């Protein structure tokens, strides 16, 4: 009887965790760049139970009209790419969240206020009349008082891709990291 009760309790726990995961996915369905969690179960002999996975399939691209919003083109030969985001501890994490803006301190951040990294580190944008991000990720500005066609390169978005053997995990902050702690390959 005790074994039956243990199995029932374990089944109820796994169902509760799966429902919580589904609720979280539903609540964030319209968040730009959100990657849904996947409930995966170990084999029948495993005692590990429910595992978290992450859906890395591309989301839908939405046209916003915002000049700073970007979407990563998956049709390239290198496969999926990710923006590099600076974590609060100065580390590196990855995201496909492309709703970008310039914060009050002049840095390029995503919609969650996380620093988007360029090839030269954090992307600092001086005061400008015009700003654009080219298809290759190059960020250019027309400085205040400059001639209308005088665009100046600021930096280029740092994009990375995964090695076939690397596995992504999603942190509580919604950012993706490589499971073994290695870094992604620059794109």
Region roles according to the model:
Residues 1-187:
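Amphipathic alpha-helical polymerization modules
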